[in-house]
Amino acid sequence: EVQTGKGIFVKRNTISGSIYFKLVKINYLEIIEIKAFLEQKVIEKIIHSITPAQCEKLECYLRAMESAAKDDVYSAADDFKFHKIIIDASPNKTMGQMIFELRKVLDNYAMEFKDTNSTWIYTIPYHRELLNAFKEGNLKKACDAHNKIYKTDISLFSKIDSQRK
């Protein structure tokens, strides 16, 4: 929409109440902490409502990850799809968008370094624990499995940070 007056005003095509944030100074360990907090909230929201069909899709992507891991390959694409199913199951779509944006920042940063996949491959059994917890509807087990993934992420990004210094 364009309005005339003293100059031209071009209205941004946004939804009322939308927020956009740009990180000026980035602490990647803090971003992981924020992402993990939001993911934990998603787990809490969906633990009793995730459907058998969603669990079946999670199983499919997890099997692909496990199969690739046998050849010492970490399938980032299947990992993304696995987590997308979980996040998309949440009724809070804004939270999901924030998680994906934070993940993009972290993925771009990690791509600068070698051997990140050799660390993330160790999270695959924790993904299995998470899926089993979803199937059982067991919040404590789901949070414990997620926490193991989070600690692996922290360990990896701590190594990356120390390499940069």
Give the location of each predicted region.
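Generic C-terminal helix-cap and adjacent flexible tail
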Residues: 155-165
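Short linear motifs at protein or domain termini
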Residues: 1-38, 163-165
